[in-house]
Amino acid sequence: MTQSFPNETTLNDGAKRLENEGSGNFEESPAKRIKLDKPENPIHAQPENNGAQRKKGTAPIREEYLVRSGQEPSVKQTSDVRDDDEAEAARHQERAGEKGGKQRKKQKGQNTARKFGKSQDEKGLCQSVSHSPELSPRTCQFGDNCRFEHNLRKYLKEYKREDLKTFNGMCPVWDAYGLCFSGWKCRFVGSHMTERELEDGRKELVLVEDEERKNAAMPLVEGGAEGGVFNSISTEQKVDLMKKRRKTPKSDAYTTWLDETSKQLEIHNHGRRFADENNVEANGEARDEVEDRRAQFKEPPFLPSEKRRLYFGSETPVLAPLTTQGNLPFRRLCVELGAQFTYSEMAMSLPIVQGHKGEWALMKAHQSEVLPPTIKPNQGVVKDYDHSRDLKFGVQISANKPWQALKATEVMTALCPHLRVVDLNCGCPIDLVYRDGAGSALLEHPSKLEKILRGMNAVSNEVPVSAKIRMGTKDNSPTALKLIERLVLGGPEFTEIGQGPAGVAAITLHGRSRQQRYTREADWSYISECAALIRRLNERSDDLTDTIREADDRLQAPGRRVYFLGNGDCYSHEDYYRAIGESGVDTVMIARGALMKPWIFEEIQAGQYLDKSASERLSIVEKFAKYGLNAWGSDEHGVGTTRRFLLELLSFTHRYIPIGLLEHLPPRIQDRPPAYKGRNELETLLASDNYKDWIKISEMFLGPAHKDFKFEPKHKSNSYEIEG
């Protein structure tokens, strides 16, 4: 691609110019809405074409957009695609690369230990000056020993890069909130500063605030921090966790009970096996023993709190937990486009308990995520469901030991009041997580998994607990059916001591095994089997109640119903409604489909394909850039962070093939295109898998990259480093 973009290019002029220019080989195509003949109930919508003419694995690009050898420009996408859970665990896979040696060799073309360089001022501005008027800074605690700059005019002239001219030179943070949280460090500081003359004749630089914007940006929900961010804990609270000053009495008591009960069960079951081997028959005395067996075991130290009622339905598509890509700005974007529920990136339990700053940052949610979903169920569908108390944001954790998960759940639900659910990841396939005994390794230890979920349910206060699982760890040995029965009814160990169900509120099944990778499709027929099982178990829940004593409601799933979500390869509204109508899941969790085209939630809501024009797609990129600056700051560091995550997003969105270019519908997430061109230059640019084009797109909104900025995509062939 030879077209260059000056750093002052804006969406309004740059995008339109690219759409309207171009050689005669590019067709101009306005935004279109391709709508199928949809029946009244969109669940039963059928694809337009039966796919008989389609070549498996190849996107059916229309002849006029194919590029033959020697023609330019063109797009031919590579197939270095990671499956849903690999995308979810990207950050943890990178840790494996830090160990080097054999592990690094095993990754082959993958950049596992990625580095992104630095984006910072040549010399930083002291915090005592960063938000103060020029002539009245706060006192610096380091005095003459401070290594940062205190002369504001010198900093602005010599150490800070020139202001960005994107967004018409207006700071997106100041425009949204009436003040800029980056102060003098902002790359748009010229848009919210002025020089005033004092009574003594001196001139002073001051930051400007806008009261009208500030009032309009007041949070709609109590408890939010600056920028409408929720679940942000203080430095003091993190220090208390690091120094083990914050106690977790519930987790400690329940873990002790679990350990003692497990030992008793082991002794008891050993005795039963010995009796069976010696053909001891069950006489009257033995039957009496069965009835009073539970008296030999201690009761749990406390019962779970009553849980907030949940609802999942066909009108509530869910955004999957996505590490790296599932950051706050991206989730905010998806909620705006129609996602009803979101999850944090997968957080590791032990760092949460130890107060690690990076892990606690994953708990932060945007204001739009702590509001109730925009759609509520019909009256009476869910007993005692209170829509006003519901919210969209849940967290996902990973753990390999019960005490870690319990402590993490207890402190999270205590310190973060805006959580819909705490989800346990039991499906992460990454070797580092698996070898540690977490993620999909828990599928091989169902009793341990049940203990973890029971404990989490006991200490999570009113917040429900859920689990995300895979079909199993090996291709030909699916275990999800047995595991689901255990999680819904309770395993034999806990049933024997009268503890009943595990209390899990929802289960998500990814239709792949740990062994399986993206090259094969998710198994929705198996997901359908599991959905049928859960329906039967939910319908029979009253009949399956403990026969010795009635199980306490607090031990049951909220509302005595376990919701079931399917996950894997959902790429259109047709895939979504087919999964609900034919497979019988309550709703679908969407991962790669949302990364490749975030407006999939709009399509689901509309029940039709949306053929986004190139400028419409670029406006989504622009919106992500704005939300990134709001979340990470508009200073040099924040701009660099936003650029890094924008490039991560573009590494997925470039794989989207506009449906107006396809010969047959529906599009398939596994299909790869032959070399093709877009309907205009901008559309071709957005489809490029060349990292240089991704950088070019980022510069439309974030200006030229810092000289020390470096970007290493997942695949080594796409690395980028600024050349000074």
From Swiss-Prot:
EC number: 1.3.1.89, 1.3.1.-
GO molecular function annotation: flavin adenine dinucleotide binding; mRNA dihydrouridine synthase activity; RNA binding; tRNA-dihydrouridine47 synthase activity; zinc ion binding
Catalytic residue positions: 428 (proton donor)
Biased composition (Basic and acidic residues): 29-41, 88-101
Stretches for region Disordered: 1-135
Subcellular compartments: Cytoplasm; Nucleus
Enzyme class: oxidoreductase
NADP is among the record's keywords: yes
SUPFAM superfamilies (UniProt xref): FMN-linked oxidoreductases (SSF51395)
Function: Catalyzes the synthesis of dihydrouridine, a modified base found in the D-loop of most tRNAs. Specifically modifies U47 in cytoplasmic tRNAs. Catalyzes the synthesis of dihydrouridine in some mRNAs, thereby affecting their translation.
Protein family according to the UniProt entry: Belongs to the Dus family. Dus3 subfamily.
Protein name stated in the entry: tRNA-dihydrouridine(47) synthase [NAD(P)(+)]
Species: Coccidioides immitis (strain RS)
Species lineage: Eukaryota, Fungi, Dikarya, Ascomycota, Pezizomycotina
